[in-house]
Amino acid sequence: MIVHYVAAALTSELHLLSNSTTTYNVPVSLDKEDHVSMGATGAYRALKSTKLLSQVLANELICASEAIDRISESPGDGVKKIHSWVRNFVNPMNSDRSMTSDCEKISTLLIDGEHSSIFR
């Protein structure tokens, strides 16, 4: 349940970061000019959003893998590959434990592009 709260909090922060920075304007030179680039701020927000999204996806992938382990139906080929990839890095939950390091591990792998190996 805590993983769900974390994902919800991250998603809320993503909503805040999605507001356009180009709508902000800072007049300079005694209001004669208003050319203040917000490009750097926009780029920072995009980078931060990418990191937050990788954390949300990591939480979702781990929870989905746990669910797959507990159902009798067999998932499709693509889902099997994703499940196998997650299980290479995160052990099944056999008892109560902190998910922080597991979520951080998968998040980092997503940011580094390691997931692209799933469908090669």
Model feature map: region roles:
Residues 1-120:
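C-terminal auxiliary extensions adjacent to catalytic cores
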